[in-house]
Every structure is written in C-alpha cells, then in structure tokens.
Amino acid sequence: MASSSSSNSFGGVAGVNGDLWRECVAWLTRCKVIPPDHKAAQPDAEIRILAMTLRDGVLLCNLVIHLDPSSLDPREFNRKPQMAQFLCSKNIKLFLDVCHNNFGIRDADLFEPTMLYDLTNFHRVLITLSKLSQCRKVQQLHPDLIGFNLQLSPTERSHSDEAIYKDLHSTTTDNIACNGTGYDHTNTKEEEVYQDLCALHRTSRSQTASSTSFEQRDYVIRELIDTESNYLDVLTALKTKFMGPLERHLNQDELRLIFPRIRELVDIHTKFLDKLRESLTPNAKVKMAQVFLDFREPFLIYGEFCSLLLGAIDYLADVCKKNQIIDQLVQKCERDYNVGKLQLRDILSVPMQRILKYHLLLDKLVKETSPLHDDYRSLERAKEAMIDVSQYINEVKRDSDHLVIIQKVKDSICDIHLLQNGNGSDLLQYGRLLLDGELHIKAHEDQKTKLRYAFVFDKILIMVKALHIKTGDMQYTYRDSHNLADYRVEQSHSRRTIGRDTRFKYQLLLARKSGKTAFTLYLKSEHERDKWRKALTEAMESLEPPGCQSTDHKMEIYTFDAPTTCRHCSKFLKGRIHQGYRCKVCQISVHKGCISSTGRCKQNPVSVPPPVCDRQLSEFNWFAGNMDRETAAHRLENRRIGTYLLRVRPQGPSTAHETMYALSLKTDDNVIKHMKINQENSGDSMLYCLSSRRHFKTIVELVSYYERNDLGENFAGLNQSLQWPYKEVIATALYDYEPKAGSNQLQLRTDCQVLVIGKDGDSKGWWRGKIGDTVGYFPKEYVQEQKLASEEL
C-alpha cells in the first residue's frame, strides 16, 4: 500500500491523504486568496505547486489579513521577498504568531518555519491550516466559510505521509513558480480593468467591417491606434478627474506618491498618439515603425512608474484610511469617472498593462504584414525594440524590489559597519543577493566548526551570527566577509560527515586562489550543497566572465546610473544593479553575453583619427561615423537602390585582420548588405580590402573604386556599385564648365544638378560630385548648394 501511495504522491494519493492538500487548495480558493484558475487548483496539479505557493509566507500573511483584517498590519510583512530565506522566514514567523495570538491555535498544532521553507514536513503545514480553517474565531467571523478537516490514522501517517513529504522535499526545486502572493489573481484583475478601459469593443469592429472593406492588417493598425487613444483618455482622466480634485487637499509630494509620473506619461502619449496618426497619412515622412523606435527611450519612464506603483496604492489606501474627506473625495471621483465600477487603485494599474502590450500589438501587425511589404523589416525592428523596453521595465521593477531586500539585509545586521571591504556598510556596491541561509563553516587553520547565517551577493560572502530571535524578527551580528573574486569553489569528497550537528553533512570547499587559506562549508542536503555551489560559482563567473578570454578589454561588472545600451547589440542594459560590464580602459558598456564580440580594446576608438586615410573621412558625404548595423539598416531601408555609407563599427574589430570600418549598401534585391573592411600588413604600410581579390592603399581609394565598379568580385551575385552617398547634398550649376580632355573632372551646364559626393578638395576650391553615372571633380565656386537630404528618410 505504501508503494501505491508513493507512486501517486503528486497527482493525488488515494484516500483521505490524497485529498488533503486539494481540500486545502479549495479552502484557500474559498478564502479568495488564490483564484479558481490557480495552477495548484488544476486537475493535473501537483502538491509541490501548493508548497511553493506557500513557501515565501506572503500568501499566509494575506490569508490571516483576509480572515481578520485587524490581525496583522500589511506593512509588517514582506510582500516581495524574492525567496530570500530570512525574509520568507520572517513572513512565516509572523503568520504563526498571528495564528497563536489572534486565532488561538495551540503550539502543538503549529509547524516550525523551517518545515515550510525547507519543505521537510509539509504535512505539518497542512495540519496548521486545517486547524486555522476550523478555529472558533474564523467560524464566527466567516460563518459561511467551510473549513477542511484532517483525519489520518497513525498507520497512514507513517506510510503515506512520510513517502509523500520526503519526496516533496527531494524533488521540489527553486525554479518552480513560487510566489504565494496571489499575483495570478492580481494580474487577471488588472487585465480585466485594462480590457474594460482600453480594448476595442466588438461592436466597434463589426460596424467598421459592415461599412468598409478592411484587410486584417488594417484591423490591427486600427486596434493599435484606437486602444492608444483609449489609453490616453485613461491617463488624462487620472490627471484631470483624480489629481485635479485632490490637489486642493494634498500637497505636490503626496500627489507624486499616489500618481507617479502621470503628468509626464500624459505628455509622452499625447505626442506618441499624434505621431502614430501622422504616420498613417498619405506621404507621411515618418512611418509607424519609426515612431515606436523614436519613443524607445521616453518609454523607459515606465520602469520608475511600475517600481512605484505598489507603494502608490499602499499610500493611497493609508491616506484614505486616515482622512475621511480624502476617502469620500476619491469615491466621488470614481463615481464621476465610471459610475464607481472601478476603484482608483485599479485604474492606476492600467499604464503597467499598456506598456507591456506594445510588442504584442506589433507582433500581430508583423504577422499580418507580407515579408515583401516595404514596412516588414522596420516593423520587426520596432517589435524587437518594444520587447527590449518591456524587458528593461521588468528588470528595473525587479531590481527596485531587490533594493528593498538589500536594505532589509543591512537593517538586520546590527553592526554591519564592521565590514572592511570597499565602502563598508554600503551593501549596494556588492550587487544582488543571490542566496542566503544557515550553514556550518570551518576555517582550515582553525578546526572549530561554527554555525553561521550566510548571505551570498554578486561580489561578497557575508557571514553573520543569529542574535536572540523574537517571533517575526530576524537580527544578526556581523562575523566575517570574503571577497568572492579571491576564491574558487571546489567540491569536497562526497561522503557525508558526522559531527555534533548531524543536520549538516554535505561539504563544499571555498579555497583562496592564492592557496593560503580555505574554508569548508557544511550543508544539510545534497540539494542544498548544489544550490550553494551554483550560487557561488555564478557569482565568481560574473566577476570573471568567460567572454573576457576572447578580448583584451578590461571588463568589470558595473552599475550604471542612467539607461545605457550595449555597444555590441544596441539593446538596453537592464535593471538597476550590475546591469552589465564596462571596460576600465575604453569605457565601452556591454552585456555579459556580448563581451566575447567586443573585439580589441582601444583607449577611445571613436575619437582616434582614422589611421587609414590620407584625408579626413568626415569630408565625405558617405561617412556616417560611429553607427551599428541596425541603425545603418534603418538609415538605408527607404533610400534608393545603390545608397551606401561607411561607418565605424561600435564593437570595433574582432580579429587582427579586421578594421573598425564597414560599408553598408542597399542592394538591388532590397536587402541591406553589410561589408567589413579588412586590412593586411604589406611591409611598412597597410593595405585595405573587402576580399583578397583587390587591395587599396587607403579606404578612400577603396570606396572610390567601388563607386565606379561593381562588388561582384568580392561577393558572388552582388552586381551593384556604390552609387549614392547616404548624405545627399544637391548643388545647382551657376555657370558652364568644360573640363580638360582626359581629366577626372565633371562637365557642368548652367542649371544642371550635381550630387555632391565629397568636399575632400575644398581647401583647393574643388568638390567631388556625380551627374548621372559620371563621377569627377568640379570647381565649387561654379555651383550653389540646394539641400541636405534628411538622414531619416
């Protein structure tokens, strides 16, 4: 029988035992702390999902607040502990304290905090919840709320439970979705609010279909424009119908706390909607995709908004609770806005929902756009840009929550000032908290094993000792710290060790690279040991990324104060803590995964004068300066076939045979061709080429040659020359000019137009131009410049 029970441990064990955890889920659903469609409530759900949902203690604290709002101040527990053990344990302790003091649950019916966090005895957790569901106070406060009962015989507990919960502990890992906050429910509600306020109504779409012959692509464009208009109405309402009336009762600081960056969002989206509508007009100068690309950076303000949103809702609730006039005014504003159907706290969530919709709307538009359509490639880039923005916002929000955790770590260590590393007590310099927990440690020069609580950050391992711990409180005294850059992790022998505390049996060796000292860490299980080894190894790898072996850049993990893009891929470095890496020499900034592609380090590769030309490249209209592939493609995609530019590659050369330069050309098959310029050492001089077929003394000579000859000798099938510089200066001839026979000069006729290719001979009175297919020099005094074509065309 035990074998049969064990085999069904997560899908539902036979008998009462198999139903117990599902009955607990059903009760939590009746309490409305998890929604009916929660993962744990699905028919194929496993018990581990419930365990991980409860593990951080957030849902448990929300549960007792739901059962009795006076039992716990919501500000006392950590709503986003991000699985930091000391914060999760604090939440669990608070829950147990409320169960005992407020609901009268006996100590014998309470579980120990480690039983839940370590998942060593989840059965006891279910017992506590069962007792809570049936206690007298809950029945008095919620007479219609049916609890759940636990009735197991000793035989069933000794066989079924032991097998189930041992298996639960050994198989449940930290990468399972584990938030017990009811976020799924919150997100569902926020999505419903967004749909109610911003989404297109079906009647509107059907009316359009009945009156106009629209393609599916047109529907998607209309959905984007109309939902944006609806969203701007929501922002405007927040500003005028809520902030406006409240201005008479709250000061500006209080308004900023409740309505973070709302005024700025109104301004941004007013301009954004105008640009979107303008992009749909005939002969529009800027297309829709470019509008999204242009607003890529302004949209980063949502990182701050989303980070402040939860605090805004809390502050609003606190103000309304303390001030009846404010509370009544807010309710009046809600009635005036939408007949009271939605609360202000619900409406405040709409901006976060909207910013995360843009890449989805663009994805729909891309799918409804033919790959042969002129806008296809630019729409794909716009979609990728909005995905990048969404990821940036999510990481800023996550790191903002993490900064709170770091501050709580600092507050929990009473003498953190004893740290002797870096700036002492400023924990922010050490990066994110990767792992924390209890372990034993033994220095090899000191045979005494010590019980410690440890915090692993990106850069440092901090050892503390627990002080007298009250329920719901965690305080430590500082003992030691180790810069992880000085260490490596080694697996000690795999045999379990037996000491005075038999809980800590599994070893991990932390050895100094200098070989002078080493420490042995003792953990409770193989799973714990593997978790600590992984955290320490990842931290050390982040300090010395493998990609650094492929370049001579002096990279260091770095926290950037302002939004920064990666020099290699041009995407944002995301978050607020250690977003990426910066070279200590040339200051370029990159993602960890892009380090190996950064090429050779130069003190300042952009400002160094081009070493390959006998004249300044900036004198030529085809020279674009520092520019990545994506930007070059955007500059050229809507230009005529044969338009080209020479650019400095931001990442620099990746091999000794590459230069920092590349040509980008719009070809006759409507594709942007990017061509690296290579170099070869020829005795005392350097030669430049696109391939080994032909070499030139300067890059100017190379460009000049391929202006007159196609590139097919280097690239099979590319029967295209460099025809039109991307900066087009048009000049009109004022006089006739007849060049000498056999010279490299242009013939001019009064009023004829010349495309000015370059002004490299300006000091001598000559410009270089093109008329038709003929390229040559002409006297600059014989012409008058007309216009400079926009680089954005």
UniProtKB/Swiss-Prot annotation:
UniProt-recorded Gene Ontology molecular function terms: guanyl-nucleotide exchange factor activity; zinc ion binding
One of the record's GO cellular component terms: cytosol
Domain of life (superkingdom): Eukaryota
Domain PH: 432-541
Pfam families: C1_1, CH, RhoGEF, SH2, SH3_1, SOS1_NGEF_PH
Alphabetized Gene3D superfamilies for the sequence: 3.30.60.20, Calponin-like domain (1.10.418.10), Dbl homology (DH) domain (1.20.900.10), Pleckstrin-homology domain (PH domain)/Phosphotyrosine-binding domain (PTB) (2.30.29.30), SH2 domain (3.30.505.10), SH3 Domains (2.30.30.40)
UniProt domain Calponin-homology (CH): residue ranges: 18-137
Record function comment: Couples tyrosine kinase signals with the activation of the Rho/Rac GTPases. Probably plays a pivotal role as a signal transducer protein during fruit fly development.
Name by which UniProt lists this protein: Protein vav
The organism of origin for this protein: Drosophila melanogaster (Fruit fly)
Gene name per UniProt: Vav
